[in-house]
Amino acid sequence: STEFQRYMEIVIVVDHSMVKKYNGDSPKIKAWVYEMINTITEGYRDLYIDIILSGLEIWSEKDLINVEASAGNTLKSFGEWRAKDLIHRISHDNAQLLTATDFDGPTIGLAYVASMCEPKLSVGVIQDHSSVNRLVAITLAHEMAHNLGVRHDEKDCVGVVYLCIMRIPVVEDKRSYFSDCSYIQCREYISKENPPCILNKP
């Protein structure tokens, strides 16, 4: 129903390591990102959230923050940069950094939990960890869901017959769904906190 419907305007920032990885081929980078957005848009329909790509920024010359192997440090820097720079240039609700940097350990993404609309905290960082677009897209969807108050799926979540986006580790499947747990957590967060920035239809 429409009372549940929310609109999440996101900006994807592609860092300089990505530019190098794709040999400076902007059209290729854009196509890669657009394909991911199509995938997550499909997944987020289950949560009554429309995903709108408000901006795609490519750091073609150099990084505007210090992107490092520590996902935590990179996340903090990216959030601070968003609050002091990006938010003043592009109207959006949430920003995600896509990097070719290999984060420490098994980490392929990191985001703050239940932080939608917060200037420094409505962010995530994603490692471009696979040549399979869908797998990177699932990581993106996963980190964005943390921003929306969704935690990792426990074993007793309904929907384990198919792959769930919030499962750890993420495995490949034709279509990734949010589990009932994710749906309930997202609804609870939205009804309790009612983050204002995702109410307006752009």
Swiss-Prot record:
Domain of life: Eukaryota
GO molecular function, a single term: metal ion binding
EC top class named in words: hydrolase
Residues noted as binding Zn(2+) in the record, renumbered to the chain: 142, 146, 152
CDD domains in alphabetical order: ZnMc_adamalysin_II_like (cd04269)
Cofactor descriptive note: Binds 1 zinc ion per subunit.
Record flagged with keyword Zinc: yes
Annotated Gene Ontology cellular component terms: extracellular region; plasma membrane
EC number: 3.4.24.-
GO BP terms, alphabetized: proteolysis
Keyword match Secreted: yes
Distribution of this protein across tissues and organs: Expressed by the venom gland.
Required cofactor names: Zn(2+)
Binding positions for Ca(2+) per the UniProt entry: 9, 93, 197, 200
Family, similarity comment: Belongs to the venom metalloproteinase (M12B) family. P-I subfamily.
Role this protein plays: Snake venom metalloproteinase that impairs hemostasis in the envenomed animal.
UniProt subunit comment: Monomer.
Name recorded for this polypeptide: Snake venom metalloproteinase Ac1
Lineage start: Eukaryota, Metazoa, Chordata, Craniata, Vertebrata
